[in-house]
Every structure is written in C-alpha cells, then in structure tokens.
Amino acid sequence: MIEFDNLTYLHGKPQGTGLLKANPEDFVVVEDLGFEPDGEGEHILVRILKNGCNTRFVADALAKFLKIHSREVSFAGQKDKHAVTEQWLCARVPGKEMPDLSAFQLEGCQVLEYARHKRKLRLGALKGNAFTLVLREVSNRDDVEQRLIDICVKGVPNYFGAQRFGIGGSNLQGALRWAQTNTPVRDRNKRSFWLSAARSALFNQIVAERLKKADVNQVVDGDALQLAGRGSWFVATTEELAELQRRVNDKELMITAALPGSGEWGTQREALAFEQAAVAAETELQALLVREKVEAARRAMLLYPQQLSWNWWDDVTVEIRFWLPAGSFATSVVRELINTTGDYAHIAE
C-alpha cells in the first residue's frame, strides 16, 4: 500500500516548503449545508463558531446544557479541533419551548444563531465547506504561484486526506489487523473508522496509479463517468469516446475511480482491468470490505476547488480561499502546493 506522502502528484512534487496552521486562525472552515432552517419542527439547528475544541466535545456539552442525551445532538461532519470553524449542530428538543441558547457557554465556542428545523441533521448532509488558509514561511513563492494557476485549470487529485487513516495510520493498521482475523469488531466507531480507512486507501491507490499515465484525463473504454456534482455514473463505450472526451475536457463530466467493496465496481473492460490491477496486491483489504458487506461505489478522480483565489501578504505568506464539496479534503489541495511543515500539517477537516 502506498503511503499517503508518496502518492502520485498531479503537478509534480512541490519544490518548496511552507508552514500550515502555525496557529488555528490560519485554518478557517465555514460549513455550507446548502439549505436554511425550516423555522419550525422538533429539532433545533445551532450554528456555532469554535476554536480549540472538537465537534463531538461541543455536541456533548450542548446536550448537557439542554438536558438531553448526547445521541440527540447530531452534526453533518466533524471539524478539526486545531482550526477556527463554523458549523451546524442539531438538537432534538420536541414539545418544548425554544431554549435560550445565547446562555450556552463553553470555552472556545460561541453560538452564532439558532432556529427550529423539521428534520434531524445527518452525517454527510452538507453541500460543502469554504476554506481560508494561510501558508507561512513559503520557501518558493514562484513555484506556489504557478501551482495555484495550474490548479485553477487542472484541479488536484481527489485523495482522501491522511486524517482519514488516523494518527500514524492507526485506522488503516486496525483494518489490516481485522482483515487478517475473523474476530468480530463490536465497537461501532472502530468498525466505521477501519472500514472507511480500508476503502479510502484502495481508492487513493487506484488514483495514484492512474495519475502515472501521460494523459490523466484521457477517457478509456469502460470508464465510469459522472456528471459534475452528481453521484450517479454511466459507462463509456468505444463508440462514444470522442464525444465523452470533449465533455470531460469541458469539465461537464468527471472520470471516477472505484471505492472498492462488495458488488460490481462500476467500470468495465479496459478501465475495470486497470483498477483491479492497481489494487491486486491488497487482497486482504478487499476481502474485508466484501466480508463486511461494504458496497462498492464511485468517487471523482480529480477535484476542482471552486472560487479559488489567493493573496500574497508578503513574499513568504499567502492567504488562499476556496470552496470544496462535501467529502473532499483541503489537505489534498495544499499537498499540491507545498511540502508542509508543522505539528498539524496533515490534520485538517
């Protein structure tokens, strides 16, 4: 299995270094649900601003304040502790008057707004996230500038970030140990983390191998293509390759890579043979996903940061702003810009 740091680069390995997250204010994330609260219902959506505390910790504190069980507080996604983040929490408080959430106090956390909502906020139920990052001590401004220009046109690999695999790769190591035994894993969180790490690692490996091709965005027979921003896909046939290539070049269609699991992967013929060969050595992880009935799926191979802009504060400091759809990793963008340094260089979303 290829280590995250050794995955293939789309724009070549960065020539310079830089410091990511010298302080939490250098990494700002604003969650975009893609909808507004209903204004009525048994749930309360709470928009919070936090710094120095993780999402689960804040959710548990909110549950305690509202005198409800912690399982009654949900969120669309985890946000990093070592960053300044805005996100929504959802508390189920049926048949009660609206509590005064302005009285909720927690160090490093502030309630920005709250309103009633009809439905529970479920994991993954967000449109995306807006990022504002500050890279400091940049050693090669010209290289970073050119890479930002290139990313506007060609995007970046849609890799799962290193944080998906746990500190020191612990989640992936757990998956490998589990794959080598038939011992049931009772802990639901461990099951989820380990299976997710296994599937994400296989996806990254497939993308890394595809990026070694001369023309990364060349459609081949049997590729699974999806409309940009959509989840469904269709299979490319030889007769359609020229027209499909035009639509991929126009960013109307995206080439996808497999999230291996049980069932068909989605590709056929040449594309399927390539994907299977890319992860042929990872038989244990593939068998684990099939054994645990994790359904195969697809994910876009490349990621195009939206609304990408940047501003150099000086020759060694740049502020970068962009928006990414849900499930994408800001660190996969930064990775194409600089070789990061700092204690939290890999911890982002």
From Swiss-Prot:
One of its GO terms (cellular component) is cytosol. Residues 155-303 form the TRUD domain. It catalyses: uridine(13) in tRNA = pseudouridine(13) in tRNA. It is an enzyme of class 5 (isomerase). It comes from Shigella flexneri. Belongs to the pseudouridine synthase TruD family. Pfam families: TruD (PF01142). This is tRNA pseudouridine synthase D. The active site is at 80 (nucleophile). Responsible for synthesis of pseudouridine from uracil-13 in transfer RNAs. Its EC number is 5.4.99.27. The gene is truD. PANTHER family: TRNA PSEUDOURIDINE SYNTHASE D (PTHR47811:SF1). InterPro entries: PsdUridine_synth_cat_dom_sf (IPR020103), PsdUridine_synth_TruD (IPR001656), PsdUridine_synth_TruD_CS (IPR020119), PsdUridine_synth_TruD_insert (IPR011760), TruD_catalytic (IPR042214), TruD_insert_sf (IPR043165), TruD_pseudoU_synthase (IPR050170). The lineage of its organism: Bacteria, Pseudomonadati, Pseudomonadota, Gammaproteobacteria, Enterobacterales. NCBIfam families: PRK00984.1-4 (NF002155), tRNA_TruD_broad (TIGR00094). Keywords: Isomerase, tRNA processing. Substrate binds at residues 27, 129, 329. GO terms for biological process: tRNA pseudouridine synthesis. One of its GO terms (molecular function) is RNA binding.
